[in-house]
Amino acid sequence: MASLSLNPATNAYDFETEEVAGSIQPEGAYHGVTRLIDRRTGRQVIHPKYSALNLFRLFAVHQGMGQPRQMARTTEVLPNAVEVRWPATDAHQGELIARYEVVEPNAVDLTVTLRCRGTYAGYELFMSNYFDPELRPHVYLKANRYGRSAEGPERITPMVNDVFRGTVLVFPRDAHAARRCVDGRWDRSEWGAPTVQMCPVRRHAYPLAFLTDPERRLGTVLMSRPRHCYAISTRYHAEDEADRMVPYSAFDFSLFGDDLTPGDERTVQVRLALTPLNEGMTQPLEMYREFSETPPPAPPP
């Protein structure tokens, strides 16, 4: 079992496994995994200014409920995990418990539990992940395109296009999920929150996304469970830096998605992992299938 050690210089908790080394930062706006290094190649995949597995925004239908980045929290350190708790507030009537657990040989699991005290339609935790801009994004999409048939999901790289330039691409789970990002929540600017146009496109085949460094054949993989993650968002890729929307590569997972009433409790899980890649880049999907066959996590006591 990997252990955590406090780094006095950063106040983050450093860890090392058989295949990766990294840091978990419970404090500040960019809490989460601030460093993740592939020990085989020495490559650091997280953008140095930001983090991964970062709890960014809280939403319901046409409602913004604040940003965990800016909210008070408490931290408990366990042998191989860091647990962060955000108490309920007037703006967000629910307690959030985020557990970052190091998993051998190459992963960090984020388990988030919501203990709801309010009534919310389409509740969402928007979780962000910011990576080295050299990394290229990939997603698997359902192959049911109009007028075309295919034998299985399609793996694609979202590339820049004038049709959706300047927007964030959203790959929803289903028709209900596709409505969430355009129901008004991303027009809410309370407490200085940013607004952006979200562009729902094709439906994802799995709650799975990965990025690649073609030269090193390294995959940075994010995965969740179908009932835990209802949409994946990304920034389109562009070979010309002038065509890029932002100076980093990123994936966001929209978590929960339920209609909630006081007393409801929900738990979701996301895994961040690194893997070598073969020529066919089959490892991320293999990792997802193995992950999806494991039992879902239990909520904390």
Name every feature range the model reports, one short phrase each.
Residues 107-164:
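Acidic (Asp/Glu-rich), glycine- and aromatic
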Residues 10-12, 81, 95-99, 105-111, ...:
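Extracellular structured ligand-interaction cores
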Residues 56-108, 114-122, 136:
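Extended, loop-rich substrate-binding clefts of extracytoplasmic carbohydrate-active enzymes
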Residues 20-24, 28-33, 106-108, 117-122, ...:
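Primarily extracytoplasmic ectodomains and periplasmic/lumenal surface modules that are beta-strand-rich
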Residues 19-26, 94-102, 219-223:
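Broad, structure-driven detector of short, well-ordered beta-strand segments within folded domains
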Residues 2-71, 78-79, 83:
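Acidic-aromatic substrate-binding/catalytic surfaces of carbohydrate-active enzymes
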Residues 2-16, 175-300:
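Beta-strand-rich recognition/accessory modules
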Residues 146-196:
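Low-complexity, serine/threonine/proline-enriched polar segments
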